[in-house]
Amino acid sequence: MTRMLIIGPPGAGKGTQAARISERLGVPAISTGDIFRANIKDQTELGREAQRYTDAGNLVPDSVTNEMVRDRLSHEDVSGGFLLDGYPRTVAQVEELDRILEANGVGLDVVLLLTADNDELVSRLLGRAQEQGRTDDTEDVIRHRLDVYDEQTAPVVGVYEDRGIVVRVDGLGSIDHVTERIMAALER
C-alpha cells in the first residue's frame, strides 16, 4: 500500500510523473484540478459552490477544497493507496488531510518532492507557454508563480520533513530518467 503526495514547483513535471508513478504502483493519481473539474462537470453541490468562486475570479476556499478531497479519498479505489497531486498547499490543509486520513484509519507513507532549478523551470514554462499560445505567461509572471510556490510550500514541506517522510528527487531530465530516479528513491 502506498499513500503519497507529489509536491513540486510549476513546470517540474508533477502531473506527468504522477500518472507514470501511479501506473507503476497500481494506485490512482488524484489531482485537485481533476477533482474540481469532475465536481463542476457533475454539478455536485460542492462543484456548484466552487464554480461560483471561480466564475467570480476568486480562489476556492479551503473549506470547499477540503470537502472535495475528503469525498474523493472516501472512494473505494483509494483503499489500496493513492498519489495525491496539488494538495495540501498550506499547513492548514496538511492538518485537514491528517484528519481525513486519521478518520480512515491510515496515514501518509511518503511525500515525493520534485526539485528543479528555477532558471530551468522558467525556460521550460516559457517553452510550454509558447507551444500552447499562452501569451500571458511571461518570464515575470512565471517567476512570480515560482516565488509564490516557494513561500506557500516551504512550510508544508517542513511539516513533512519533521515527520521524516520527504523524499527529494531531481525533476529535471528526460521523463523516463526522472521516473526511474523516483522509483529508485521510493524503493530505498
Curated annotation (Swiss-Prot):
It catalyses: AMP + ATP = 2 ADP. Pfam families: ADK. Keywords: ATP-binding, Cytoplasm, Kinase, Nucleotide biosynthesis, Nucleotide-binding, Transferase. Residues 31-60 are annotated as: NMP. The keyword Transferase applies. GO terms for biological process: AMP salvage. ATP binds at residues 11-16, 128, 173. AMP binds at residues 32, 37, 58-60, 86-89, 93, 134, 145. Consists of three domains, a large central CORE domain and two small peripheral domains, NMPbind and LID, which undergo movements during catalysis. The LID domain closes over the site of phosphoryl transfer upon ATP binding. Assembling and dissambling the active center during each catalytic cycle provides an effective means to prevent ATP hydrolysis. Catalyzes the reversible transfer of the terminal phosphate group between ATP and AMP. Plays an important role in cellular energy homeostasis and in adenine nucleotide metabolism. This is Adenylate kinase. It comes from Kocuria rhizophila (strain ATCC 9341 / DSM 348 / NBRC 103217 / DC2201). The gene is adk.
